[in-house]
């Protein structure tokens, strides 16, 4: 322990007092039930759902106690995390039969149940869903085609990659099983697929534990083999990008073999509790609590790292919680950094207590010395990588893109857009060039031919080299505020899917706004009103009637106050580390709140006193809360002018945001007259936004890229603001619209699929630009990337995208980059929220958000994933420049 202070021991459990109105609301003594965490909704905080189990046992001191099937139940109880109150639920619809030793998993605001055993024998393998949408509790029986896992009990199931229901092992009444099945919840009709995983397969077993880590690894732990012996091994099941699943044996030594135990993940730490040994003897006290730290690849107990299995005469100091946790067949779930345990069996005594442990040192999993580059190899062994490093010769597995991939239907929708996007991008470009009389302009020869200067130390406070942290920080795919502590670390080796990009789109020209406005003195505290109303990372909720809370006069005054600040800022900002960098938000205000909630927010109650914020543009369009997004960012700029920084994106232009949702949103939410007034005023403000930022003179941040025309930072600095796209500036067009080529093997300049006149630039251009300007890194936004961030040019350029599930179809993650004082850059990610599947009430036709996005996608669809073959009709436009 002394040499590895970042390895924190297993937590201590204690009894938690709970409340209920009637005795019927309390779950009472029971075992072999399930306890499942359900994320918070708009109207309710996080909950635990307790279902089924046995309320009576048979046998005595002379025999191994077993559940009495006549005492098995199908009652449902809900525990409110915030009020600590139990309530019995009586959902509508046909409930599943009474059962115990079944399996359960949360899917959004629903809980799925499968299998088990009851008074009538084995339960069927039907899937039952408890739907809690809008707090209207209802049972659904899910129709699944074809053969399934079959009736079984003592098995495990969880939702993997927020998409696949995976169930493994168990007992079919004749023997213990070793098979594995998966059901893709994103594809209808629903079909169980029997998996044929590669790798070291676990032996047949029952009464194991299984839990899915937030990045997509399903961990199987312990169990009882065919001879009745307890097992102490652990296996990870993961899916490669080609669809092939693989079992991998986990390293480390468990404190004890066990079965009929429970295990749940909190971040990267699997918390294991209770269990029994051969013959049904409850596990020894000192081994009753354990943690498998998957970030370090070691097992821990209350005293630290475990190097060998504990004997029954362990020398560990006794702790009251040891005896408390001696139990089996209990239920367990985690919410945030807390682990909850209910009931179970100890000897011949049914338990009804409710326990909690807090993984208070959990955040050290993210900031611990383990993350340092000289220790990255300690996290895995050659046979098993907790960072999901793939076997040699295969593609990396269960990366952020797993469960974030595009289905065929989504790809078809994206493909429809290439011609439309090319048309609008081309029209903007050609209109600007014709107006300036500079069509087919080439870069200045003086700039292009200036000598390349080798990078040298510039004497700034941060003299260390810029480097990307070896691990990214990823938060679970859950609703804001519900599982807010569910964070894990992901090795960057895993992000080899970084050439997959989606291209945002455009379509047709629109006149530049001409309406001018008179200015009045800005009301005192207007920006504070905005911050108070919107900066609510934990509990912000979309307005029910969609009416925006500011009127046009207030919008004008807010824009004026922010404009005065932007007018006095440089075109290229000079910034210092530490700083957080955000990519495209596109009106997805909920994602901004999630990022603030999980990784800190700009307030004196947050982290603004010691870290700055930089936003790279594209604040509006596409999402349905562009007004909230831009007004909050402007208010934060007014409140913290030296700490919050905004630069311009290509959607901060009237020609573009008239087409992709912002103008429509302003009219819809503010009325036609006030809406057009506000939309025009915002676009006047956008013309004053800075265009790039330098961090410590070593990192340049921009929205698009360097294109064909930008060779020096001075070219950007010379752009005079305010400026509109019809000014015909080739530098501005490249800065806001250009993209890197598809991958590092494609050098030089090539036409951009966005439209004629736009280009992509190769890694050679990036290297040349960095050398010439003594820079080490370019951070840019502009393109949707599946993992939220993507490296290019051997890591000299990073693309950053912060909005998740772009256009409602991309299913991408969102990310920010945290640039530390030592210029070490840590990517921090969020997944898209789980889709509301399996529920008629939550189908797309019932979702306002989906309807907004779908209608816009039909009119202005995004283009296909980067790297897909270009359609035959468009290949002629891809001549080399």
UniProtKB/Swiss-Prot annotation:
PROSITE patterns: SER_THR_PHOSPHATASE (PS00125). GO terms for biological process: brassinosteroid mediated signaling pathway. Binds 2 manganese ions per subunit. Residues 368-407, 436-464, 503-522, 837-881 are annotated as: Disordered. GO terms for cellular component: cytosol; nucleus. InterPro entries: Calcineurin-like_PHP_ApaH, Kelch-typ_b-propeller, Metallo-depent_PP-like, MPP_BSL_C, Ser/Thr-sp_prot-phosphatase, Ser/Thr_prot_Pase_BSU1. Residues 374-383, 445-460 have a biased composition (Polar residues). Transmembrane segments: none annotated. Its main location: nucleus. Keywords: Hydrolase, Kelch repeat, Manganese, Metal-binding, Nucleus, Phosphoprotein, Protein phosphatase, Repeat. Expressed in mature cauline leaves and at the tip of influorescence, including flowers. Expressed at lower level in young tissues relative to older ones. The active site is at 651 (proton donor). CDD domains: MPP_Bsu1_C (cd07419). It is an enzyme of class 3 (hydrolase). Mn(2+) 1 binds at residues 584, 586, 618. One of its GO terms (molecular function) is protein serine/threonine phosphatase activity. Interacts with CDG1 and CDL1. PANTHER family: SERINE/THREONINE-PROTEIN PHOSPHATASE BSL3, SERINE_THREONINE-PROTEIN PHOSPHATASE BSL1. This is Serine/threonine-protein phosphatase BSL1. It comes from Arabidopsis thaliana (Mouse-ear cress). The gene is BSL1.
